[in-house]
Amino acid sequence: MKTTPRPVGVLLAAALLLVAPPFLCAQRAIEAEHGLVVTCNSYASDAGLEILRKGGNAVDAAVATGLALTVTYPFAGNIGGGGFMLIHLADGSPDGRDLVIDYRETAPAGASKDMYVGPDGKLIQGPGSSTVGWKASGIPGSVAGFALAQQKYGSGKVTWADVVEPARRLAAEGHLVSQWTAASLKQWAKLLGQFDESKKIFLKNGSFYAAGENWVQPDLAATFARLQKHGPREFYEGETARLIADAMAQHGGNLTLADLKNYKVAERAVLRGKYRGYEIVTMPPPSSGGIALLQMFGMLEPFDVAAMGYNSAAKYHLFAEVMKRAFRDRAEYLGDPDFIKVPVAQLLDPAYVKGRMADYSPDHATPAAAVPPGLGKFVAAAPPESKETTHFSVIDAAGNAVSNTYTLNGAYGSGVTIPGTGVLMNNEMDDFTSLVGAPNMFGLIQGEANAIVPGKRPLSSMTPSFVLRDGKIVLITGSPGGPTIINTVFQVISNVIDFNLPVEQAVAAPRMHQQWMPDSITFERYNVSPDTIALLKAKGQNIRERTSYEGWSQGDAPSITLDPKTGLRFGATDPRRPDAKASGY
């Protein structure tokens, strides 16, 4: 593994370092000849690298990484939640193969449309709500998704027990608590402290973990040991399943043993689009991210973005208008394709996408209220998930690649840990429409198409993505961030293609967000000049500071690029995550 600096072919990269504050200065990309794992957590990156060194492929390593994050990054890493895995198999065919593992959580059989509405007709708050406690969880999909991926698309050179081992070892022997983790556990103590098992495991019964302290999780280690011995179905039919179902029944939860046994992973076809000679491969529904991403690049294609200047008001204005139109369609038409008809082909039709910018003006913002849904009224009005998600990127020596984004939904999920298992549960039910017509936590009005139905997957913004050239991987990326996920991925890809930035600069660069409603642009603090803000306001753009809930930064995009000439891989962590690491060899 090398960290030799590379020459930058454009002056923009150097300029970026001058305008960005110190905490957003890009770290050197890690250069590797064979394989790379890039995550928000050093232990998880090393777990994936361990499997690569043992002969596993990118899928094997991704599974080990996701399981390890359960131990070392419980903020979002999980086996009690779900997500999406995008896989590229470099199997000798001219273009390889790309596929999606959809292991999103589903609503339990006992779930109902109005289950979170109180007698007063208002949404229930606190324990018993869609966000906190025993009734907030969908059926977890992570173990089933990881198992299917490893069994069907792994190398065959490492076993299921092998890929589980790094996580089991980290839980049994412990890992050193970072400053970030110690602070995070204190910040979320009010949630975790409501539940005895979580209070014991994550808060040391109120005495808290200090930075540098070794944190051992014996119950979680025992769960991983059962998964090693009995296989992944143990989580859904064995002792772990029984413990989950019994605890849920005891505390009035919704998940049953039958729910766990009947959970099914879905394999889906990827979405593909073109942008300036590159191919973008991304997520289909029930993620809204892929359609929105491809729409935005389709709208952007006719414009000479590079000529506008990297940090210019002209570029930000154009991006805001593109985002606004894509998010308008997202709000109207998208939901779980197993339950509603999503007009994917129409939304991605080149003529339709081009027509969305027919009323664009470089001098004036289009008011959000004046942006209609392009295909007429439908009203899916899908809500985004919370920002407490995590992403990781993996590539192996053969060119196989994984872009994986998964979540517990909110930070530390529902706050509930199942006694005897160490498994922290999701609060994914909050991603459904709990009350039609009521605004969600992001202020978006929620519609009927995303209403709770047993077996249904809630819509998501998660957008794991690849960029390919001539069938070969050029970029692997993705991000957490709720509705900002789509725009973060959009900007990282544009930074690489339009501005030729090396991956570390593309990831560290300032980010903006516009989601149609509310009709405003948000920027990361300190990263845009007052002159640029003034020019945008003169065009009629509304500028809003990020709220305390959102934090000062947007997203976390651990990414990998490949040099097609040398075959070298370059992995970049996001400077917005202090515990991040790129591990390669």
Where are these regions (language model features)?
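Bacterial N-terminal signal peptides
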Residues: 9-22
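Active-site rim segments in enzyme catalytic domains, especially the processed small/beta chain
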Residues: 71-104, 254-256, 400-469, 499, ...
